Amino acid sequence: MSEDDSKKEPEPEETEAEIKHEEISREEDDEGGEFSTVTISDIEMLLKDTEIWDKLLRNELSIEEAKKMFDDVARSYSKADKKKRRVEKKPKKGKVTKKSDEEEE
């Protein structure tokens, strides 16, 4: 019986380790979900911002020039986002119209 008891004791430790591993896996899954929402345009914007910061740190730009460039980058990408939203909304309206047409018939 002592052999059975010694075998049973490590099991709770293994279970705790497994639980910790599962928790870490869940955290990684949660973090992975955040990265899946980053679009190519978001990455491009971040790269341009990084280039501006790099030039600013090398004293190739003044602070005012950098601010202007940051604003330009933000504006160009916000316009692109608005266009995407409009495109996404159009199919939704089309679906609603189809449903109303079916209801009329």
Swiss-Prot record:
The reaction(s) this protein catalyses: RNA(n) + a ribonucleoside 5'-triphosphate = RNA(n+1) + diphosphate
GO cellular component, one term: cytoplasm
Pfam families referenced in this protein's UniProt entry, alphabetically: RNA_pol_Rpo13 (PF12136)
Stretches that traverse the bilayer: none
Organism domain of life: Archaea
Stretches with biased composition (Basic residues): 81-97
Localization terms from the record: Cytoplasm
Gene Ontology molecular function: DNA binding; DNA-directed RNA polymerase activity
Region (Disordered): 1-35, 70-105
Protein name per Swiss-Prot or TrEMBL: DNA-directed RNA polymerase subunit Rpo13
Origin species: Sulfolobus acidocaldarius (strain ATCC 33909 / DSM 639 / JCM 8929 / NBRC 15157 / NCIMB 11770)
